């Protein structure tokens, strides 16, 4: 038999896992596929995992959450509000065109124009972006900004080709991304797979070969099929691991469990523009009627800790003196009666399937807890694309609540409170009519431009206390990052939930 024919027969009988290993390929399964390939149009954690492999930012967080150079190799502060950034030379986009200062300027200009992106609130401190010379970008902030360098590493800061930042260009970008990142887009078959291959020319390899040549992202919405796929070796990494299956993965012959405390919190943002949620007492009653510790124990196997003020303890400015609301059904009933709702209120809980582990069960348990004090909670699940549209277009219905697990990508209270709850922030419109007065906004605005860290921390402490009193969201807990993986792949899990394939290694390579 000819050698070529023998080789073909061997290929046909080899198991798929062996072929994947020989080709340095891995498969990652999340419960939902991407909603877009445009980093300016989504901050959803599962979708962001695609962005951070396809694109680069001027600065970047390493896997210990320390800031490092990215597409900018260095920077200097010219004065209190002016920074010059030196761009990395020889970088090319995946379509072969060189990275230019014009691309950087066009990307940042898009982000600072209100309405152009959903990440605008994270960039409003920037006043202007200009080109000093072909290798230097100048950024001038509105006022002294203590967080400018980390803003350039956050969600939405991924640098795009200038031609794809136009109104027509972003439509193309949403379907066929072009970045400078470690992995290039190959194909996207909706509801089936998204494929990337290593960008052999990526500057970050530093002369080394990529450990993984090809990655397939396979959405599997239901928990059980996702677990089975891992156990069979059909996928190498799964996210959103059900807590009650964690031990089985940890003890599996060919699987392991990776965990780390996260920078993300779990809460429900609410549209409190109309009664009854426009009444602070009703919002507080919603919180008192939820047993957060029981949720953590029974739904999440103890993986989490209660939060106060929607701020994670890893964020600069976190105030440990402010405590979470205790579970107090009697207090909840009292507040409802005082507000004139002794017979209860109607509230709808919305969530996108795959937002987080056990999301539907979470909504159902909260609705059950509320029922004990007369709050009638209705559960509405939707596919992730519909959830993203509800979020982006700010169309959570009045007296509706939307499940989220936001994080401050700045690792600072500005990224969690200003970005989301300031009137110019992401959820600002939902707080109309129930704002805690101008004091909260003044505090956050002053802190945003305060260089002295002690003073900024004091401003944040007062703002968090006001927000915790006003309750514009139902605050639950700080998450754990949990992955199930095959033993053929290894990586250090990141607290920021980023699955960066360039940080992974394969056994034997």
Predicted regions and their residues:
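Surface-exposed binding/hinge segments that line
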Residues: 2, 21, 76, 121-164, ...
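Detector for C-terminal structural segments
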Residues: 26, 146, 189-193, 198, ...
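N-terminal lobe/hinge region of extracytoplasmic solute-binding protein
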Residues: 29-79, 109, 178
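A structural "hinge/loop" feature
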Residues: 32-48, 71-72, 97, 119-120, ...
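Gly/Pro-rich hinge or "lid" segments in bacterial periplasmic/extracellular proteins
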Residues: 66, 153-210, 214-216, 222-224, ...
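Aromatic- and charge-enriched surface segment that lines or borders ligand/interaction sites
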Residues: 73-117, 132, 138-140, 229, ...
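Structural transition elements
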Residues: 183, 305-338, 353-362
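Ligand-site clamp/hinge motif
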Residues: 201-248, 376
